[in-house]
Amino acid sequence: MAANTDRNSKPSVYLQEPNEVQGVFNRFDANGDGKISGDELAGVLKALGSNTSKEEIGRIMEEIDTDKDGFINVQEFAAFVKAETDPYPSSGGENELKEAFELYDQDHNGLISSVELHKILTRLGERYAEHDCVEMIKSVDSDGDGYVSFEEFKKMMTNKSGNNSQAEPPK
């Protein structure tokens, strides 16, 4: 995710820049061979706290692996990311957003806290202070309660206006 150099603007979580997509892809590509295997995908999902079954990993791989070579390359990954952040998602889009939200909502109370965000980022190998996570939450928290609800998360993930007022971990 790209660094934000303008101190007055808030960073964005959207993976719009090729280097941002490549950076996230590289986190999944544990062995650095330029492709994501089912085992690598399972490892990242496990690090995020998901107990995804082998069958579900297979379904995810099948959905993203459009050339059917058994791996996800960076182009397939980028196409998937673009589809997942489409402001007009397919009928299954909301369910997929809900699943993503639930990965962050560790205590399953329907809200993402700065503590939960910090835990997930730490599991992903990101090094952010808790106050950074508080700021990320604030930038998406439209009702000011200190948490991100599913509706706030959905709005953030489907916003394509080019508005960079959404949260991304500062680098």
UniProtKB/Swiss-Prot annotation:
Which Pfam family, any one of them, does this sequence belong to?
A: EF-hand_7
The name this protein goes by in its record: Calcium-binding allergen Ole e 8
Subunit (UniProt): Homodimer.
**Taxonomic lineage per UniProt?**
Eukaryota, Viridiplantae, Streptophyta, Embryophyta, Tracheophyta
Per UniProt, Ca(2+) 4 binds at: 141, 143, 145, 147, 152
Keyword Translocase carried by entry: no
Provide the residue positions that the database annotates as binding Ca(2+) 3: 105, 107, 109, 116
Q: Does the keyword Electron transport apply?
A: no
Report the residue ranges that make up the EF-hand domain in this protein: 16-51, 52-87, 92-127, 128-163
Tissue and organ distribution: Expressed in pollen.
Q: Where does Ca(2+) 1 bind?
A: 29, 31, 33, 35, 40
